Amino acid sequence: MSEGRRRIVRIAVAALGLTALLALQPESARLVESAWARSADGTTRVPIVRKLILSDQARRFLALQYRSYPTEFMGCMIGETRGSAVVVRRIAPADVEPSHSTATRVVPHQTCEDAGWSGTVGVIHSHPGGERCWYYFPTTQVASSDGQSFASQPYPVDAIMCGDHVVWINRNMAEMQLPLAAER
């Protein structure tokens, strides 16, 4: 074997050895960190939700509620977290005094769990007229009252019903939209 060929073989073996060594290393903390978020109280690590899935029943309920009331309504999203997705099976009514629901504000009397709803993965409320459907003021990182409210809740997601779509947010404070019409 010629000297040039031996040199190429040594380089190839060294490269394979380094590749194998790197493959055995644990994942970068930065990469792992980006897939997890802190809970509302800042003590627990929870997976970042990247997808919100509404059942047909939940979509129908939201459409009916939105059309039925000139004031904000609030519901408890009942379901489960599956990996990086939250699956909402149904929307249960939140415990709200009628006098605590106006066209621009809704305040529950008690938490979803205290009202008897187990399996709550988030809270959803409406914005009649589909206005101001955001968790941050446009072009800023300044949280609206909805963003501030979500930050103090323990749930992985929060949502705003805005006519033909739902605006929602996850623990990473990333705001997303979901059409109300089921994707077929």
Q: Where do the language-model regions lie?
A:
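Mature extracytoplasmic domains of secretory-pathway proteins
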Residues: G122-I124
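Hydrophobic alpha-helical targeting segments used for export or membrane insertion
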Residues: A14-L18, L22
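Conserved beta-strand-loop surface patch within small alpha/beta domains used
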Residues: L21-T120, G129-R184
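Compositionally biased, intrinsically disordered low-complexity regions used as flexible
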Residues: M1-S2, E113
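N-terminal Sec-pathway targeting helices
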Residues: S2-A15
